[in-house]
């Protein structure tokens, strides 16, 4: 279960674009209040920019928060802010929630790769990193399918898919204990390399920015 829990961290990393199917309905709704189509589309791409910002801030946050604390905080921020449009259909509040959603995603993304590199080596590490990449694609496909099923209930309902973040949080807390024997080593490594972003993180952030 530990491996499944670790891989589940990547299931929702590119989920900000999963709600695209709901854009027509969202545009129709917010046009009643004077919001343009471009402003509504921004709600989909905004998290991508927040992810990039968080990747730069992570080196500072790591000085006060452990890896486990960052992942838990990221999942809570991701899930809670992701569900806001489900209960509140106010553009400014949704705009803020999408921004926080991206920041939470950035906190998780920063650790989804490194946590595997720290816990596994050799073929296991290579295999797990490959599975992690697949988890992103599978997660995106599942969420997009779920959005399509929820859309007939109204566009606010599609944001319910982000409630899955709480399940991932539960799996992480229950099945991924912090490896005490690696604690000191990881802290030293963090001091040496906290200011640098891993190349996969750079590629991920740049990909989101280009798509947005």
Predicted regions and their residues:
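Residue-level signature of mid-helix packing/kink "hotspots" within the transmembrane helices
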Residues: 17, 47-56, 140-141
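Interfacial helix-cap and linker-helix signal at transmembrane-aqueous boundaries
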Residues: 26-27, 31, 61-62, 146-153
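Juxtamembrane helix-start elements in MFS-like secondary transporters
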Residues: 35-44, 129
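Extracytoplasmic
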Residues: 7-31, 37, 58
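Juxtamembrane intracellular "pre-TM" segments in multi-pass secondary transporters
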Residues: 177-205
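Cytoplasmic helix-loop-helix junction between adjacent transmembrane helices
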Residues: 91, 97-135
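Helix-loop-helix hairpin linking two adjacent transmembrane segments in secondary transporters
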Residues: 131-177
């Amino acid at each position: 279960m530990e491996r499944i829990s670790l891989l589940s961290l990547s299931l929702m990393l590119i989920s900000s674009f999963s709600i695209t199917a709901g854009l027509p309905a969202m545009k129709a709704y917010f046009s009643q209040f004077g919001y343009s189509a471009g402003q509504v589309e921004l709600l989909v791409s905004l998290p991508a920019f927040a992810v990039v910002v968080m990747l730069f801030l992570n080196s500072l946050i790591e000085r006060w928060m452990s890896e486990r604390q960052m992942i838990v905080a990221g999942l809570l921020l991701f899930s809670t802010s992701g569900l806001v449009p489900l209960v509140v259909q106010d553009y400014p509040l949704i705009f803020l929630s999408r921004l926080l959603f991206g920041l939470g995603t950035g906190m998780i993304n920063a650790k989804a790769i490194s946590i595997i590199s720290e816990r596994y080596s050799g073929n296991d590490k290579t295999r797990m990193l490959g599975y992690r990449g697949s988890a992103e694609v599978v997660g995106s496909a599942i969420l997009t399918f779920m959005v399509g099923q929820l859309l007939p209930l109204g566009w606010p309902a599609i944001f319910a898919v982000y409630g899955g973040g709480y399940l991932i949080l539960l799996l992480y807390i229950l099945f991924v204990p912090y490896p005490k024997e690696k604690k000191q080593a990881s802290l030293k490594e963090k001091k040496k390399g906290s200011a640098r972003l891993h190349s996969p993180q750079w590629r991920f952030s740049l990909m989101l920015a280009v798509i947005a």
